[in-house]
Amino acid sequence: MSRKIVEFRNVSFRYDEEGPWVLKNCSFEIYEDEWLAIIGHNGSGKSTIAKLLNGLLFPQEGEIYIDGIKVDENSIWDIRKEVGMVFQNPDNQFVGATVQDDVAFGMENRGIPREIMKKRIDETLQAVRMQDYLLTEPHRLSGGQKQRVAIASVLAISPKILILDEATAMLDPVGRKEIMQTVNSIQDSQGLSLITITHDLKEITRADRVIVLNNGERWDEATPSQLFKRKDALREIGLDVPFVAHLSDAFRNNGITIEHSPLSHEQLLEELWTYHSKM
């Protein structure tokens, strides 16, 4: 098994002393090179986890470790070298006058030599398919393009962990598709631990593992295919599986054998082709 890169140990958090607990005794691990999805309805605590992982917040109870380092006020800058984040609003993340300047910004703050910076700018923009927009100003980019630049800016500082906190929530369908294609490509090629935080179950189909939060507690953990079989239980906590899972059930209910649990329309077509070839 791969090495643990993140440990949440009995973590509880609330935003003020008299307020409700946003997270309650939450424990989980994340491993090197793993894609973990964290899902839940609005207010379930998932975005709070993202902020705790990056040292933007600290737990009132429990402990968090990133690559063996305890997250606290003394380690915050070491932690942020290891953890990169992309948030919901692409307009709030652009700090440079051009795409090139934005990707360079984090590296400049770390004193990375200019030749290395230039190489990383080229590599990361190619990784997110934005190499043709090097000198483009941010207002000329779509929301999806801005988010891809935000991902490149994080990759340029070479984190061990990349967190996408509802990174597609403010995008149109085209932008969402662009980002998920980018995420799939990065996970295949970059060799880092990826954490995607979302309420949209269509975005978790490629994840290795899924943690489900409900009212601040860890409600379930499963692979995507296992989770999609629990449609009724998910619906009770305000979540719904992708249309392809409902479609698969409809075929089964009409006597068509679907042996596996398809996670995409392409996989469903393969199942139907297999069924047809056996007739």
UniProtKB/Swiss-Prot annotation:
InterPro entries: AAA+_ATPase, ABC_transporter-like_ATP-bd, ABC_transporter-like_CS, ABC_transpr_CbiO/EcfA_su, ECF_ABC_transporter_ATP-bd, EcfA_1, P-loop_NTPase. The keyword Glycoprotein does not apply. Residues 6-240 form the ABC transporter domain. One of its GO terms (molecular function) is ATP binding. Keywords: ATP-binding, Cell membrane, Membrane, Nucleotide-binding, Translocase, Transport. It is an enzyme of class 7 (translocase). Its EC number is 7.-.-.-. PROSITE patterns: ABC_TRANSPORTER_1, ABC_TRANSPORTER_2, CBIO. It comes from the Bacteria. It is found in: Cell membrane. Forms a stable energy-coupling factor (ECF) transporter complex composed of 2 membrane-embedded substrate-binding proteins (S component), 2 ATP-binding proteins (A component) and 2 transmembrane proteins (T component). ATP-binding (A) component of a common energy-coupling factor (ECF) ABC-transporter complex. Unlike classic ABC transporters this ECF transporter provides the energy necessary to transport a number of different substrates. Belongs to the ABC transporter superfamily. Energy-coupling factor EcfA family. This is Energy-coupling factor transporter ATP-binding protein EcfA1. It comes from Oceanobacillus iheyensis (strain DSM 14371 / CIP 107618 / JCM 11309 / KCTC 3954 / HTE831).
